[in-house]
């Protein structure tokens, strides 16, 4: 599996991202396609004795900051790690894209660049939530402020497919949580 990783996203990037990427290569045997300021990433790896084995780097010159307006940033920062990473995913250069950067920009970028499956109007953020009996998948963790019924149905289908294929659960149950 090849995972495209935003090396510039998150509070302690690129160091924290590099540490995680190197650990993923070592423990899971995945390939990493790291997107970011290549010179800074290489220098950070060297300064901290982090091996770049299994990590291929793609240089880009811009970063979408947390304070940037998401849609404007996606449209104007074409050489940002998020935009470049999402384009690489769209081109089939990796199996997944991971970023600890701007959630809003990632959400907008996924819709505009990668696009959604037929019948899915909006992407949904998802997270595995630990529980006593069995972890569960929580979809649309507050990313969409207003959801129509057909969007909720699409989220249910996406979540069910994910839990079935990734977690190996044959007949996952679906529930609606609301405040």
Enumerate the predicted regions with their spans.
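Short, acidic/small-residue loops that bind anionic groups at enzyme active sites
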Residues: 107-142
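Contiguous, glycine/small-aliphatic-enriched amphipathic segments in soluble metabolic enzymes
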Residues: 1-112, 161-177
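Ligand-binding beta-strand-loop-alpha-helix segment within the catalytic cores
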Residues: 134-178
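Short, charged/polar low-complexity linear motifs in solvent-exposed/disordered segments
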Residues: 32-33, 125, 154-156
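Acidic/glycine-enriched edge-of-secondary-structure segments
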Residues: 5-6, 113-116, 145-151
